[in-house]
Design a protein with these regions (language model features):
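Alpha-helix-loop-beta-strand connector modules within alpha/beta enzyme cores
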Residues: 58-60, 64, 98-109
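Feature marks short, surface-exposed loop/turn motifs that line or immediately flank catalytic pockets
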Residues: 43, 81-83, 121, 152
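Active-site-proximal beta-alpha core segment in soluble small-molecule metabolic enzymes
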Residues: 1-74, 83, 87
């Protein structure tokens, strides 16, 4: 999956099993202040269980590292709570449920906690407004080219994610299918394909 970060096939971090040896090596270097543990298990997570499993492992690791003489003072807990996107029945944990789980699994350690709760709290807070610069009719396809591009909103091109697209001032007339695209010379510069909307013009 494109947004997982905590599996063996992902390029990030070090494995749980190898972490004690990495910390021991860092401590030997002398100039490094081994202050904490940072972890991130992925994005768009809508189930509390993966967090709880990961945080319990972090509690075990922190306890072990402290027993080995490392001055562990903080845990940075990554893994994003998901947004309920169209076409899914996923409901992310409520922030209160998440907070209670953090306290239950890690509260006894008495460390500083840095939380990376993901896009759930802000994912639906913003909009991208663009202007139609050209409507291109091809055989069987109509492209609405706008002045925003994949560099402004990468998620549809990168992940194939769905974002709602609506005209600011809808025109009268029957809905039809439009491909909403950006002007970049890149085939993946697409915001939505076959979107049903009323007439669109420059």
């Amino acid at each position: 999956h494109k947004i997982t970060t905590g599996k063996a096939e992902n390029k990030f971090g070090v494995s749980y099993a190898s972490a004690p040896a990495v910390y021991a090596r860092a401590a030997e270097l002398g100039a490094i202040d081994v202050a904490g543990i940072d972890m991130h298990i992925g994005s768009q997570i809508t189930d509390i269980e993966p967090f709880e499993q990961a945080f319990r492992l972090m509690a075990e690791l922190a306890t072990r590292l402290k027993s080995e003489g490392h001055n562990i003072r903080h845990l940075d807990l990554g893994g994003g709570l998901g947004v309920p996107y169209r076409g899914t029945n996923d409901v992310p944990p409520h922030p209160d449920e998440y907070a209670a789980m953090v306290k239950r699994t890690l509260g006894h350690l008495g460390l500083k906690y840095v939380l990376e709760p993901g896009r759930m709290s802000v994912g639906n807070a913003g909009i991208l407004v663009s202007r139609v610069i050209y409507v291109k009719e091809n055989e069987g396809k109509t492209f609405v080219i706008q002045d925003a591009a994949m560099n402004d909103l990468m998620r549809p091109a990168l992940y194939g994610s769905f974002h709602r697209i609506v005209p600011v001032s809808p025109r009268p007339g029957a809905d039809r299918a439009w491909d909403i695209v950006g002007p970049i010379c890149e085939s993946t510069d697409v915001f939505g394909r076959d979107r049903q909307m009323p007439p669109i013009a420059v």
